[in-house]
């Protein structure tokens, strides 16, 4: 077939691909990879599942199952994408045309630097796509450009870029057809490779101009053709250049309404979803998109009918909930648009966070539902299957069932067998026939299901290499498991599996909590007894800036007769002091005077079990569903942090708000108290059925899976409204209950009973993640069970506030915090210019608001206010995992004062954290912090921001494995025409962290931040020891000269080549990095983008992931590092 000429119709024009007279068929178009028309798959009458159509299209295109999740089906005009679960019905008089396209995009598809598929080792990471996917992506992009689907401007720059793309396209054609450029141009016009708007523009030019353009294209084509690049390299270059021409083309946008709006302009909004940015939104005329969350931050997505009547009855309300319980609500004009959005977010979540999770069944891929039902992995590679068996102990007979990475109709069974040399791993092939039966190669007869086939193997019917093998245990998929199905992006940590190791026991010196003096506490009445404590109501008195503060608190005093459990009691306090979440009780601190006393916020309505006993059957099912869903949110937060609670029960669930006048109830999970790991068997038996069975077998084992068992028991407790039937049994019968693997009596509500049964599975690995629990609870909330079970449904339905409480603030600007709702809790820090306080933003006035850190100025003159506003604007524009999150601002009366509201990180600054926990922080952890700070600074540099105050005191600790850069009070944005900034009024400055050019000429740049980063490395590896701090070391070098200013003497030392010494036991490679950062000339210092890979390599080497020499710094000897 002749190549396309200038007049040849371009795909995907329906007139050249389908006849309008064709009826009663469904057609799926694939982008044309050659000179011919697009390939078409046709399907006849009946129902067709969208995912099945995608599989057929993938087979026809040569797409492997590993890459299947990047694709989806869309309408011809791309106005609507279909979820994998969509069913197309083909009738006699209907013809439907669909496009099979890549829907899920990531930046820099082709290298491993910015994004890649996860590998067991860094050198085993693989690219996101392979060559067939690359060819498909090229054909898709080219079709969009030449058909005019991709909007392209007509500026001179854009015209030049489009002509460059045409040259690459022509060079690719010449490679494919083995033609010389001159021969190709005889049959193909370069204008056939341009967008229609540019073709029309060129056609209107004079003959001389058109001739000049043709000559330019011909010369450029000859130069490109002379290169040795193959067709795939030319495709990759084409795609990269096109993505630079239209950087926003990889994102999808959705026009939505805002709930509660009465129509009109103010009720409109826009959602944007992108693989490298997550979800962003804008409202009304606002042009700047506000980031809402990245995909790993999503906990829950729900779809329900919008509360409207009349023509808008088809509208759907989609609610997205973040890990911090903030919600985004958007109203879509119909169900297809809502499902399209949810399917997009759902797919990105599986690609970036958890390949086995789905947020709602309406968009769940049927193949994924089959995998969940059959306990089967997706198309993971053999390396990950073997690694999973090794992680499980390489027990003979253990196996992994997975989809084939090469064939859509095959499964692979990887089995661990024992031979004289140790464990070995064998593979078996399972084929699915067109009729739906399964046949394992080596077995004589097919089976109707995978479960039936594997049951045969469990009975010893499996032979591998002539050896009979009996299957013993299945290594099932776990939430957030790392595999080749996960895409890792630079600046994002790969997902952490929820299956964590048993909780470690910390020494008393390693615990973290605020110590409260005894004379600041006021004791009131006794409220009862806990298992190991006496409980009182009280008040805490503080004096802040000369103002007396009084806070109502709960005092939990450790009983003197249980002093052997003191350490575990303080561990619980340490746990609660390191978390900040609205559904977790706030711990003010611990009073160590006399008997240890835990000081907590006071929750007025008390434990939920006592409340339910008082109200009896008057509490509707919808109210109880809200309670258990909020409890699931709290436990999901702890699961994401890898922190087991260990003592989940209704008595630990406190009711902060009863819920009335359309608002839902609000609960808080209390501290765990004494851990099951230190309790005797008798005490553990007393906690049956809330304590997980594995905790009785191995008392030291406390995992996240135990919390799921306790949650299931608590759900039963809440919905039954009666005393737990097992609690009154004698200890022997309680133990027998577990030994016989009995279950609690099943509620009449079948779906609820199934959820409880899944949470209380006797095999810990069988229990669902809390994200999955929240998803299942959503389906219960949307059901009609309460109409059958509530005593007076007619009276309760109008007051059933399932969502109304959350909608009260949906249309307000979430970044504006009303000052009167910021409730002071304690002071976090105070400096020369300002102070930072811990506050609760509580607009409902019932202690249900989120904890935030609030910064305010000490002196509020015009200059300070201007600098403070600049700091706020800088922080507001920064969005990185390694920079403290901006929440908003709070204005005083008449906007005469301003406060900055940020996320609250309970562990405080890195300097204090290193000093407190030096004993358990090794070099590997310090290198992890260094790498994260470097990534944060690299991001700042990309935004042309100079920090100017980078020091350990300005790094905050989110968790023991995550730090964030904070305090942008001195930060500056570089001018567009310069790479440095000259400060005219330096003021008070941290001179011992400053580069020489900053000290001498007040010049600040990204290179001066690199110098400060070297000082931060020094701080890290000295653990911020005050005796050898940067200031102490430099002052020691200066000697006793009092007449010379410290700044001048410091500058003389630096110009003489004096530098901070190598920290004790600091790895030589790290000290070499410090010295590179301290190069006298800014041009000689490495960039943060060059430092990042070096630190990552050192960190990987310290963890044993790569072969790397990692030695302590010997006296006077150094090892050199090279940067490429």
Curated annotation (Swiss-Prot):
Disease affiliated with this protein: Severe combined immunodeficiency autosomal recessive T-cell-negative/B-cell-positive/NK-cell-negative: A form of severe combined immunodeficiency (SCID), a genetically and clinically heterogeneous group of rare congenital disorders characterized by impairment of both humoral and cell-mediated immunity, leukopenia, and low or absent antibody levels. Patients present in infancy recurrent, persistent infections by opportunistic organisms. The common characteristic of all types of SCID is absence of T-cell-mediated cellular immunity due to a defect in T-cell development.
Organism: Homo sapiens (Human)
Coiled-coil regions listed in the entry: none
Keyword Repeat: yes
Reactions mediated catalytically: L-tyrosyl-[protein] + ATP = O-phospho-L-tyrosyl-[protein] + ADP + H(+)
Stated name of the protein: Tyrosine-protein kinase JAK3
InterPro entries on file: Band_41_domain, FERM_domain, FERM_F1, FERM_F2, JAK, JAK1-3/TYK2_PHL_dom, Kinase-like_dom_sf, PH-like_dom_sf
PTM-bearing positions, type Phosphoserine: 17
Any single biological process term in GO: negative regulation of glycoprotein biosynthetic process
Membrane topology: Peripheral membrane protein
Effect on the protein upon substituting residue 939 to F: About 80% loss of STAT5a activation
Domain (SH2): residue spans on this chain: 375-475
Stated consequence of mutating residue 169 to E: In T(-)B(+)NK(-) SCID
UniProt key word Ribonucleoprotein: no
Protein's job: Non-receptor tyrosine kinase involved in various processes such as cell growth, development, or differentiation. Mediates essential signaling events in both innate and adaptive immunity and plays a crucial role in hematopoiesis during T-cells development. In the cytoplasm, plays a pivotal role in signal transduction via its association with type I receptors sharing the common subunit gamma such as IL2R, IL4R, IL7R, IL9R, IL15R and IL21R.
UniProt binding sites for ATP: 828-836, 855
Catalytic-site annotation from UniProt: 949 (proton acceptor)
């Amino acid at each position: 077939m002749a190549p396309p000429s200038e007049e040849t119709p371009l795909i995907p024009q329906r007139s050249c691909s389908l006849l309008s007279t064709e009826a009663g068929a469904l057609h799926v178009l694939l982008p044309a990879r050659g000179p011919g028309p697009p390939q078409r798959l046709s399907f006849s009458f009946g129902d067709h599942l969208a995912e099945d159509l995608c599989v057929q299209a993938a087979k026809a295109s040569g797409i492997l199952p590993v890459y299947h999740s990047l694709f989806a089906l869309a309408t011809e005009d791309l106005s609507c994408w279909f979820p994998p679960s969509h069913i197309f019905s083909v009738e006699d008089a209907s013809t439907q045309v669909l496009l099979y396209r890549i829907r899920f995009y990531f930046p820099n598809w082709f290298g491993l630097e910015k994004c890649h598929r996860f590998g067991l080792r860094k050198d085993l990471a693989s690219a996101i796509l392979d060559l067939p996917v690359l060819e498909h992506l090229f054909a898709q992009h080219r079709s969009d450009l030449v058909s005019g689907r991709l909007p392209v401007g007509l500026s001179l720059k854009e015209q030049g870029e489009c002509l460059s793309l045409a040259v690459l396209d022509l060079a690719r054609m010449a490679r494919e057809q083995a033609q010389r450029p001159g021969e190709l141009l005889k049959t193909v016009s370069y204008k056939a490779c341009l967008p229609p708007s540019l073709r029309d523009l060129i056609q209107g030019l004079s003959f001389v101009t058109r001739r000049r353009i043709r000559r330019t294209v011909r010369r450029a084509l000859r130069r490109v053709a002379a290169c040795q690049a193959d067709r795939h390299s030319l495709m990759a270059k084409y795609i990269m250049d096109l993505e630079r021409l239209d950087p926003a083309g990889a994102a999808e946008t959705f026009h939505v309404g805002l709930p509660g709006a009465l129509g009109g302009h103010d009720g409109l909004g826009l959602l944007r979803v992108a693989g490298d940015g997550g979800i962003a939104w804008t409202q009304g005329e606002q042009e700047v998109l506000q980031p809402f969350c990245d995909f790993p931050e999503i906990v829950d997505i729900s779809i329900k009918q919008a509360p409207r009547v009349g023509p808008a009855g088809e509208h759907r309300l989609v609610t997205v909930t973040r890990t911090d319980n903030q919600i985004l609500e958007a109203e879509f004009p119909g169900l297809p648009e809502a499902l399209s959005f949810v399917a997009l977010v759902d797919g990105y979540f599986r690609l970036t966070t958890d390949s086995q999770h789905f947020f709602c069944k309406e968009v769940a891929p049927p193949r994924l539902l089959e995998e969940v039902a059959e306990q089967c992995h997706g198309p993971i590679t053999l390396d990950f299957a073997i690694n999973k068996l090794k992680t499980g102990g390489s027990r003979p007979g253990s196996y992994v069932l997975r989809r084939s990475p090469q064939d859509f109709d095959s499964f692979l069974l990887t089995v661990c067998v024992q031979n004289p040399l140790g464990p070995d791993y064998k593979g078996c092939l399972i084929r699915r026939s067109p009729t739906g039966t399964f046949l394992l190669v080596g077995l004589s007869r097919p089976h109707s299901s995978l479960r039936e086939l594997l049951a045969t193997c469990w009975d010893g019917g499996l032979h591998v290499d002539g050896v009979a093998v009996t299957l013993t245990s299945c290594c099932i998929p776990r939430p957030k498991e790392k595999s080749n199905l996960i895409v890792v992006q630079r600046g994002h940590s790969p997902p952490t599996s929820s299956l964590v190791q048993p909780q470690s026991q910390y020494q008393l010196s390693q615990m973290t909590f605020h110590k409260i003096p005894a004379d600041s506490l006021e004791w009131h009445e006794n409220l009862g007894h806990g298992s190991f404590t006496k409980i009182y109501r009280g008040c805490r008195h503080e004096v802040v800036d000369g103002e007396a503060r009084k806070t109502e608190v709960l005092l939990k005093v450790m009983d003197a007769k249980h002093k052997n459990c003191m350490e575990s009691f303080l561990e619980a306090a340490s746990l609660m002091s390191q978390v900040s979440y609205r559904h977790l009780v706030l711990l003010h601190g611990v009073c160590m005077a006399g008997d240890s006393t835990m000081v907590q916020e006071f929750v007025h309505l008390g434990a939920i079990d006592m409340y339910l006993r008082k109200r009896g059957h008057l509490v509707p099912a919808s109210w109880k569903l809200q309670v258990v869903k909020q409890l699931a949110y709290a436990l999901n937060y702890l699961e994401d942090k890898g922190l087991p609670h260990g003592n989940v029960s209704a008595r630990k669930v406190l009711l902060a708000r009863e819920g009335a006048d359309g608002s839902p109830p609000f609960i808080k999970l209390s501290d765990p108290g004494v851990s099951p790991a230190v309790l005797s068997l008798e005490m553990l038996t007393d906690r049956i059925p809330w304590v997980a069975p594995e905790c009785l077998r191995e008392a030291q084992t406390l995992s996240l899976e135990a919390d799921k068992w306790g949650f299931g028991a608590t759900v039963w407790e809440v919905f039954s409204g009666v005393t737990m039937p097992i609690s009154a049994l004698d200890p022997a019968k309680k133990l027998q209950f577990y030994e016989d693997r009995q279950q609690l009596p099943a509620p009449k509500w079948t779906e609820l009973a199934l959820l409880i049964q899944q949470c209380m599975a006797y095999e810990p690995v069988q229990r669902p993640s809390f994200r999955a629990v929240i998803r299942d609870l959503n389906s219960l909330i949307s059901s009609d069970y309460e109409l059958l079970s509530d005593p007076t449904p007619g009276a309760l339905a109008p007051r059933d506030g399932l969502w109304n409480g959350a909608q009260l603030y949906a249309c307000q600007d979430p970044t504006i915090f009303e000052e009167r709702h910021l409730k002071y809790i304690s002071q976090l820090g105070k400096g020369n210019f300002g102070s930072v306080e811990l506050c609760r933003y509580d607009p409902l006035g019932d202690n249900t608001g989120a904890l935030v850190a609030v910064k305010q100025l000490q002196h509020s003159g015009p200059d300070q206010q201007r600098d403070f506003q600049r700091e706020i604007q800088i922080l507001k524009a920064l969005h990185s995992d390694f920079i403290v999150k901006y929440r908003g601002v709070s204005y005083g009366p008449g906007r005469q004062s301003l406060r900055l509201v940020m996320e609250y990180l309970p562990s405080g600054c890195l300097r204090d954290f290193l000093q407190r926990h030096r004993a358990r922080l090794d070099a590997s952890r310090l290198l992890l912090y260094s790498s994260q700070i470097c990534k944060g600074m690299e991001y700042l540099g990309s935004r042309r921001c100079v920090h100017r105050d980078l020091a350990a005191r300005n790094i905050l600790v989110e968790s023991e494995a995550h730090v964030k850069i904070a305090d942008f009070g001195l930060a500056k944005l570089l001018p567009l025409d310069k790479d440095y900034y000259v400060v005219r009024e330096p003021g008070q400055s941290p001179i011992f962290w400053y580069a020489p050019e900053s000290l001498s000429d007040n010049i600040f740049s990204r290179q001066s931040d690199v110098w400060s980063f070297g000082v931060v490395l020094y701080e890290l590896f000295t653990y911020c020891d005050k005796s050898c701090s940067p200031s102490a070391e430099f002052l020691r070098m200066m000697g006793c000269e009092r007449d010379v200013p410290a700044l001048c003497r410091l500058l003389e030392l630096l110009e003489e080549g004096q530098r901070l010494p190598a920290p004790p036991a600091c790895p030589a490679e790290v000290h070499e990095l410090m010295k590179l950062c301290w190069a006298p000339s800014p041009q000689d210092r490495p960039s943060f983008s060059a430092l990042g890979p070096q630190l990552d390599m050192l960190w990987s080497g310290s963890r044993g992931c790569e072969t790397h020499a990692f030695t302590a710094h010997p006296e006077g000897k150094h090892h050199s590092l090279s940067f490429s």
